[in-house]
Structure formats: structure tokens, C-alpha cells
Amino acid sequence: MAAAERAWGAAVGVVRLCRRFCHVATPHTFKKQPLHQYVRRPLFPLRAPLCNTVRFMFIQTQDTPNPNSLKFIPGKPVLETRTMDFPTPAAAFRSPLARQLFRIEGVKSVFFGPDFITVTKENEELDWNLLKPDIYATIMDFFASGLPLVTEETPPPPGEAGSEEDDEVVAMIKELLDTRIRPTVQEDGGDVIYRGFEDGIVRLKLQGSCTSCPSSIITLKSGIQNMLQFYIPEVEGVEQVMDDDESDEKEANSS
């Protein structure tokens, strides 16, 4: 009998404890709060909407032939079908993401590809392990913000896109660049832009990881030039075109 009373007392104590700390629902409480409010209430307070999963996106990195450039792949489209180069902080006024990446100490240039972002550091002494956490956070925060990647469109350089005024040779050069050469260069985190053809010389602009790559001349001569000459006999050579700021930097580094 005593054991039964103790068991009953323990059961009553458990029920009271549950009502006190677990807030067991009763008909009285349902009148105050409908059942759907209990069902929809999350177990933990949410800091962001459930649909905002991009904050936890998985970003992959890929090495490039340039040891100072690293390719960041966010797993979603960046510019989809085109590329955009930001060689200096001044050029980043068109993109909120590029501006934020330049605020990271040690970042020299930024390049957007169809589905990747190439970041180039200032020198080989900088450790990627120190830069990558800030770059990861900047990319994730930007995609979570929903802001547009580019706020001001810029027209392509003259002669880059195909034109009805192009002669047969120029049209073949542009088609070969777009179908065979540029996709390969973009896999290495860069791009090559057509700037002109005169007296048998194709003038090209290297971007992204190719800009300061030690093997950029080999890429031009052994890769691009050989392919163009193989398919287009009128091509006698390839020449690299540099912007004024790139030429000044190259002269400063060589002096």
C-alpha cells in the first residue's frame, strides 16, 4: 500500500513538473491560443527566413596556373554568359561585390566569370590561408543580400563582339576565340578579349588570372597563336595588349 502511494505521488509530481516547465496544452489554453499557433511555432528562434539558405553556400576553390590567383566557385551563376575584369579598385565602382573584395587587405584584382570569381593577391608572400576566410565571408554575405552583381553596365570594347562589317578572316578569328580558346582560358580563371587584327597580327587582351601569370607569354605564343595559325593561315602572330595602368605596373616591376 505504501509503495502504491509513493508511486502515485511520484506520478502527480511529474505531471505538475510538466505543466510548469513544458506548458502542457489544456482546453483552457486552446481557447486563448488556437492549435495552429502551437504547430507553426518553431522550436528555436530563426535568425533568417528558411528560404535564405544561400548564407550557408558551399564555395569551392580551384588553383590556376598563376600562383597569385585563385578561382572561387560559389556553385551558382555569376555572370552566366560573359566576363568582367576589375584590375584596380577604381574599376570596381560598377560592382558592389568587387568593391567589397578590394577592401580585403592583400587583394590586387578581381575577375568575374560565368560561374566563378577569380581573386588575385598582391604578391607571393601573402598566404592564401589568411585571405580565404575573408573572401569566403564576403562572397557568401553578398549572395545572401540579394543585391545585383553589377549596378552599371559597360559596353564591350570596340571590335570585341561580332559585327556584319567584319571580313571573313576577322569573323573566323572571333569565332575560334569564342568556341575553342576562351572556354579553355576561362577554366584557368581568366579570359582573352579580341582587340584587333592588322597586318597579320592579332591583338588580344588577357584578363583575370592570365594578366600577371608568369606563363602568359607561353599561353599566347604556344597556345593561342599556334591554334589561330593552324586554322587561319592569314594569322602571322599574336600580340598582347595592355591598358595604361598595366603597362606602368609592368615597367615598375621590371625596373
From Swiss-Prot:
Record field: transmembrane: none
InterPro entries: FSCA_dom_sf (IPR034904), Nfu/NifU_N (IPR014824), Nfu/NifU_N_sf (IPR036498), NIF_FeS_clus_asmbl_NifU_C (IPR001075)
Molecular function terms, GO-annotated: 4 iron, 4 sulfur cluster binding; iron ion binding
Any one Gene Ontology cellular component term annotated for this protein: mitochondrion
Region: NifU, residue numbers: 173-241
Quaternary assembly: Monomer and homohexamer; the apo-NFU1 is a monomer, while the holo-NFU1 is a hexamer composed of a trimer of dimer that is probably linked by some 4Fe-4S cluster. Interacts with HIRA and EPM2A/laforin. Interacts with BOLA3. Interacts with HSPA9.
Name by which UniProt lists this protein: NFU1 iron-sulfur cluster scaffold homolog, mitochondrial
Organism: Mus musculus (Mouse)
